[in-house]
Amino acid sequence: MPKRTQEELAVLQELILSNLTNVRMIILYGSYARGKYVIWDETYDERGVTTYYQSDLDILVICDTRDANKAERHAREVIVPKYDTRMEGKRHPAPPNIIVETPVTINSCLLYTS
């Protein structure tokens, strides 16, 4: 994983821990976790249309909260803007994707998928 991305993740970890309460776990998932991330891809189709793609940072936060939706909104409205400010000029073009769930929800999902 690129050093710059590691720095971004460290900033996100710090912001998550200082802005959400009762955080149990912070999990990186998606293409960066699998090591199959795309730094930058530019594709041209037969009509001459150009598309661009770059992997984003997918983060699952597990915390003890009564309202995971409210915590997730807080992440979008408070943590992501603070991240943008801290990483100005050095961050991914796409904002990080932060999902917040409770341990009960995660455990229920694991029971149903196993």
Predicted regions and their residues:
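Short gly/ser-rich loop at a beta-strand->alpha-helix junction or flexible surface loop bordering the NTP-binding
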Residues: 23-44
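Metal-dependent nucleotidyltransferase catalytic core
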Residues: 1-20, 46-107
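Conserved small/polar residues in nucleotide/adenosyl-binding loops
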Residues: 112-113
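Acidic pyrophosphate-coordinating catalytic loop
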Residues: 37, 107-109
